[in-house]
Amino acid sequence: MRKLFTSESVTEGHPDKICDQISDAVLDAILDKDPNGRVACETAVTTGMVMVMGEISTKCYVDIPKLVRETIRGIGYDRAKYGFDCETCSVITSIDEQSVDIAIGVDEALESKKGEMDKLDAVGAGDQGMMFGFATNETKEYMPMPIEMAHKLSRRLSEVRKNGTLPYLRPDGKTQVTVEYENGKPVRIDAIVISTQHGPEVYLEQIEKDIKEHVIKVIVPSELLDENTKYFINPTGRFVVGGPQGDSGLTGRKIIVDTYGGYGRHGGGAFSGKDPTKVDRSAAYAARWVAKNLVAAGVADKLEIQLAYAIGVAKPVSISVDTFGTGKMTDEEIVSIVNKVFDLRPGAIIRDLDLRRPIYKQVAAYGHFGRTDIDVPWERLDKVEEIKKHI
């Protein structure tokens, strides 16, 4: 049976991704000075303006306007002709402390209040909710091919802009890849869509030629392309006005880009700007860590795990898995292995993945999962041998 599946990515200059990177820059700056700081930082951008808001409890001081301007400069919005300038945009901040009611549940979990605790039971989940982790062996990154290819194309777009290969490119851009599957395995790429912001002096014909030569051919293996592959490069014909001048942006608006491109389910909680006591982030990272190690250990070819939490309670209220018919054992047996090998209380996740560190801005663009260009703890295959002992 053949089917098509499509995923998209965006560049670091996309308005929503600007916001994600600013929120995580603030988080990293606080964790660097105060590893126990509590951060829930949201950002909004529009023409000529950035607003940073949220709830932050910390003993340290960070210069938020300076962080905002440095982040925007690093992305590439450093002159007025790009429609957004790190030097002249206004920066508005509105920061409160974390709610005392939330802090009570995080600082002392329900298990602690009942006296049923060890040290790690003392950290309660920062909110209720469900988080999903996913892995598949269809790529070496253990990621679905559509999102993996889309991210690589987006990263390449920024690379050729920054290194001067295509100097007329500007920071905003999007990619989309449609993969054809046969009997559950990727066999070819059916369509590639790339929209990239550019200077007014360049024509579409030149952009199409350059993107195919310097982006697509460099990234996509030739054996996945054929005479029937369709290319859509700046299909509107012109993309000069972009970034926050073209669209307003918000933190947490690209949660599918951040994860599995729609191939795996999503619990709905965004990542950026949240410290690791927020299970929206830390438990989603842990779920990816669990799923990737299980697939690498040969438990299944494809696996999705769901974790669910109650606010102020340390232990997950439920754990479930789905192997989509590829499992080498029952789902119940896999859950049993998960409970034996992994400790999924928030305090244990923070400890085992060493999450109280400034490591988040680097994943705020081009995906939080499947990253081989950087070292992030939830991508490590450090539990494979232990899992195999239980198979």
Swiss-Prot record:
Q: Which residues cross the membrane?
A: none
For activity, the cofactor(s) needed are: Mg(2+); K(+)
State one molecular function term (GO).
magnesium ion binding
Q: Which UniProt keywords apply?
A: ATP-binding, Cytoplasm, Magnesium, Metal-binding, Nucleotide-binding, One-carbon metabolism, Potassium, Transferase
GO cellular component terms, alphabetically, are:
cytoplasm
Q: Where does ATP bind?
A: 14, 172-174, 238-239, 247, 253-254, 270, 274
A single GO BP term for this record reads: S-adenosylmethionine biosynthetic process
Q: Does Cell division show up as a keyword for this record?
A: no
Q: Which pathway is recorded for this entry?
A: Amino-acid biosynthesis; S-adenosyl-L-methionine biosynthesis; S-adenosyl-L-methionine from L-methionine: step 1/1
Residues annotated for L-methionine binding in this entry? 55, 98, 247, 278
Residue span of region Flexible loop: 98-108
Principal EC category: transferase
Q: Which domain of life is it from?
A: Bacteria
List the catalysed reactions. Answer: L-methionine + ATP + H2O = S-adenosyl-L-methionine + phosphate + diphosphate
The compartments listed are: Cytoplasm
Residues holding K(+): 42
Q: What is its EC number?
A: 2.5.1.6
Q: How is the cofactor bound?
A: Binds 2 divalent ions per subunit. Binds 1 potassium ion per subunit.
Query: Which PROSITE patterns does the entry link to?
Result: ADOMET_SYNTHASE_1, ADOMET_SYNTHASE_2
Binding sites annotated in the UniProt record for Mg(2+):
16
Binding partners and assembly? Homotetramer; dimer of dimers.
Which family does the record claim for this protein?
A: Belongs to the AdoMet synthase family.
Function per UniProt = Catalyzes the formation of S-adenosylmethionine (AdoMet) from methionine and ATP. The overall synthetic reaction is composed of two sequential steps, AdoMet formation and the subsequent tripolyphosphate hydrolysis which occurs prior to release of AdoMet from the enzyme.
Q: What is this protein called?
A: S-adenosylmethionine synthase
The organism is Clostridium botulinum (strain Okra / Type B1)
